[in-house]
Regions:
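Beta-propeller folds
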Residues: 1-216, 221-225, 229-230
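Serine-hydrolase catalytic core recognition
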Residues: 5-6, 68, 74, 204-513
Length: 513
């Protein structure tokens, strides 16, 4: 990592602030020069693996074959357009190509932990969206022949386990509904696909090593988590924890339900969303809080319960707002075309989709379209900042928590996946960064950041604040949490959350009439 520049993270707990230097490659900067070695225990020698001489590449995964004679190495080009899978001889370190994947139009999606050996090492189980949706494939270890295992206009989400004895793969997918996560099993040859979990909603599952039992954490957007066990056939279900205490406590509070909706983004793509209205509110029209993440790695409008956000959004709704969550184009779960349409121009498509949702909700849910705020963290904070600068006047206000405000200030893998390298798309970096539109800002922005954020550095919010000031704008607010990192959750998370959402509510009360 000596080639990677250091970024100082400052904390203020002592008389003299502490500075921790973090190796952090920004967009366009030098990346770590990674080499792969095999250590021969008997000879006590390091055997170099031939992955090429190009230092400007990523090693995205390594995995041993079951007989320990072969090491599988995955490498990705710096522009993330080509992924190669190499077979390395464990004795000599020499490599031969097994498989490659290339995307000239945008980028290749890398799946952490990809490349399970199955069938006694005869094939490699692979996840890829090369045919438009994320699916399973078998790559034959001797020839590199690729055989599809799953197919369809839905996506595999995780590989949970494989059973060589029965030649079965256990995986989760959103085949039943793009808002849900269900467990399935399928034969190695792609036959006998069977759904195992049954309850509508979201199933996080773990499978025992002997492939006999499943532990299932099940929830839906209106149902707190239930923990249960079952056989691998889905039968013999036994509830282990019903979360009765939480359910009983919720009976004492006016908790509004979450309702799902679907909005058409264009002629061929639809977006998932949900909306919460106050438990009791006589107003003919309500102000709207659009809660959106929008990044390429995560869906939010799912049929699942998350304590931090499910309850917090309900609490905000009971303060007098309608709260809606949307997964715009650019998010996963609906195919490569849906997710990658933001390539080289992030922000524009997502904001267009938020405007579509604003219009839809104002027509169908008694929303005051003149009183709409955008709020979220990280990439969602970026969208909130962009909405109030580049798209000033389209939304009444925004809450930008730990926002990226200039993609040149963010780490290289994510930024370059979105925008390519700065040297190849300088105009795209300029047009997608909120700091370049502060002259257009009209008001209504609340900026929040932890000063020790080692993911999205404080520099992003400080630079936005500076540019707003240079543009002679004074009608924005900001609050910084000293010595706190990206999630504002280290140390005393409950105190921080109460502080954060109290401040947000006070800001929205002033902004949304």
């Amino acid at each position: 990592e000596n080639t990677v520049k250091q970024y100082p993270i400052t904390t203020y707990e002592r008389s003299y602030p502490d500075i921790r230097n973090q190796r952090y490659p920004l967009a366009g900067e030098m990346v770590p020069d990674v080499k792969v070695f095999i250590y021969d225990i008997s000879n006590k020698l390091f055997v170099p693996v031939d992955v090429g001489v190009n230092p400007d590449q990523y090693i995205t995964g390594i995995r041993w074959s079951p007989d320990n004679k072969t090491l599988i190495v995955q490498k990705l080009t710096r522009d993330q357009k080509k992924l190669e899978v190499l077979k390395a001889d464990a004795v000599t370190g020499k490599t031969s190509p097994l498989y490659s994947e290339e995307s000239r139009a945008d980028y290749v999606t890398v799946h952490p932990g990809n490349g399970w050996f199955i069938d006694g090492g005869r094939s490699l189980l692979w996840m890829s969206e090369k045919d438009g949706y994320n699916h399973l494939y078998n790559i034959m270890a001797d020839s590199g022949t690729v055989i599809p295992v799953t197919q369809g206009k839905w996506e595999v989400m995780d590989i949970k386990a494989t059973d060589d004895e029965k030649k079965e793969i256990f995986y989760t997918s959103n085949e039943a509904n793009s808002r849900e996560k269900q467990l399935y099993k399928i034969s190695y040859d792609g036959k006998n696909r069977t759904r195992i979990t049954t309850g509508r909603g979201y199933h996080d599952v773990w499978i025992s090593n002997d492939k006999r039992f499943i532990f299932d954490e099940f929830s839906s957007v209106n149902t707190p988590p239930v923990y249960q066990s079952m056989s691998v056939t889905g039968k013999d279900q036994r509830k282990l924890i019903e979360n009765k205490e939480l359910k009983d406590r919720l009976q004492d509070f006016p908790v509004p339900d979450v309702n799902f909706f679907t909005v058409r983004a264009n002629d061929s793509m639809t977006m998932n969303g949900w909306i919460i209205r106050p438990y009791q509110n006589p107003r003919a029209q309500l102000p709207l809080l659009l809660y959106v993440y929008g990044g390429s790695t995560k869906q939010e409008a799912q049929d699942r319960w998350t304590d931090r956000f499910t309850l917090t959004m309900r609490w905000l709704a009971n303060q007098g707002y309608a709260v809606a969550c949307i997964d715009p184009r650019g998010t996963p779960g609906k195919g490569a075309a849906f997710r990658k349409c933001t390539y080289k121009a992030p922000g524009d498509v997502e904001i267009s989709d938020l405007l579509t949702v604003k219009s839809y909700l104002s027509r169908n849910y008694r929303i005051d379209s003149s009183q709409v705020a955008v709020m979220r963290w990280s990439y969602g904070g970026y969208l909130a900042a962009l909405a109030q600068t580049k798209y000033a006047g389209k939304f009444k206000s925004g809450v930008a928590i730990a926002p990226v405000t200039n993609w040149r200030y963010y780490e290289n893998i994510y930024s370059e996946r979105l925008l390519s390298l700065p040297s190849e798309n300088a105009e795209g970096y300029k047009k997608s960064s909120p700091i370049n539109y502060t002259d257009d800002y009209k008001g209504g922005l609340f900026i929040v950041h932890g000063t020790a954020d080692d993911n999205v550095h404080l520099q992003n919010s400080l630079e936005l604040s500076k540019q707003l000031t240079n543009s002679r704008k004074t009608n924005f607010e900001q609050h910084f949490y000293p010595d706190k990192t990206h999630n504002l959750s280290d140390g005393t998370p409950n105190i921080l959350r109460v502080s954060l959402y109290t401040r947000i509510n006070e800001f929205l009360k002033r902004e949304l009439k």
